[in-house]
Amino acid sequence: EWKCIAQEYVKLNIAAKEKADKEKNQTIRSIAKLLSNALYGSFATKLDNKKTVFADQLDSSTAKGIANGEFSVKSSSFIETDCLSAEIMSELVVAYSPDTLLHPQQEGATEANTQETPTFIGPTDHVTYTYKPITFLEAEEDEICLQTIEKNSPLIPNDRYPSHIASFVLAWTRAFVSEWASLLYSEDLGTPMERRCLKSVYGDTDSLFLTEEG
């Protein structure tokens, strides 16, 4: 039993396209044509054989597939950590007396003598340095690593799009255009291509662009 698929949708877009032609509204015409083509294109959509997961969330079957060559890791990237909770340690300051380290205090030294030891201040004009804060992030490497995994087999299981409908539509339109082409070139059968009269300049899935002779 033959049944129409998306008949109301197709009629609505065709009517909108014809109305736009009469009103010379190219914007509406383009939108209507785009929606009509999108219906056929949706049936022929190819499923993506890639998936992106966190490295620590790889299931056992995918990990086994990577090991035996069924899958391959196409890319690895790390997410931005600026928005994650972290602890920032600012400039580290260490105060010590090298002079004290070189001359340890003798036993029995009084506290007063210790306080009288001058603070060592070395020269600062022979070296330059820049302090940078240290960021401590509580996250493992696998927790912020994104891996894009692709299946190596060209055969992709399709349980989402009715590609058989797209194949039927494409085959039917090719048969329709082929029938018109046979009528157009019926007089040229047996004639070499270079000697035939130019009757068409372009052929699309469902259309032929003809010359004046055609």
From Swiss-Prot:
Subcellular location as annotated: Host nucleus
Gene Ontology CC, one term: host cell nucleus
Family: Belongs to the DNA polymerase type-B family.
Catalytic reaction list: DNA(n) + a 2'-deoxyribonucleoside 5'-triphosphate = DNA(n+1) + diphosphate
Protein function: Eukaryotic-type DNA polymerase involved in viral genomic replication. DNA synthesis is protein primed, and acts in a strand displacement replication. Assembles in complex with viral pTP, DBP, host NFIA and host POU2F1/OCT1 on viral origin of replication. The polymerase covalently transfers dCMP onto pTP, thereby initiating complementary strand synthesis.
Lineage of source species: Viruses, Varidnaviria, Bamfordvirae, Preplasmiviricota, Tectiliviricetes
GO biological process, alphabetically ordered: DNA replication; viral DNA genome replication
Extra facts: This DNA polymerase requires a protein as a primer.
Main localisation: host cell
Residue spans crossing the bilayer: none
SUPFAM superfamilies, per database record: DNA/RNA polymerases
Stored PROSITE patterns: DNA_POLYMERASE_B
Annotated signal peptide: none
Keyword Kinase listed: no
Tagged with keyword Cell division: no
Listed EC numbers: 2.7.7.7
GO molecular function: DNA binding; DNA-directed DNA polymerase activity; nucleotide binding
Enzyme class: transferase
Name of the protein: DNA polymerase
Family matches, as Pfam families: DNA_pol_B_2
Keywords tagged on the record: DNA replication, DNA-binding, DNA-directed DNA polymerase, Host nucleus, Nucleotidyltransferase, Transferase, Viral DNA replication
Subunit structure: Heterodimer with the terminal protein; this heterodimer binds to bp 9 to 18 of the genome. Forms a complex with viral pTP, DBP and hosts NFIA and POU2F1/OCT1 for initiation of replication.
Record-linked InterPro entries: DNA-dir_DNA_pol_B_CS, DNA-dir_DNA_pol_B_mt/vir, DNA/RNA_pol_sf
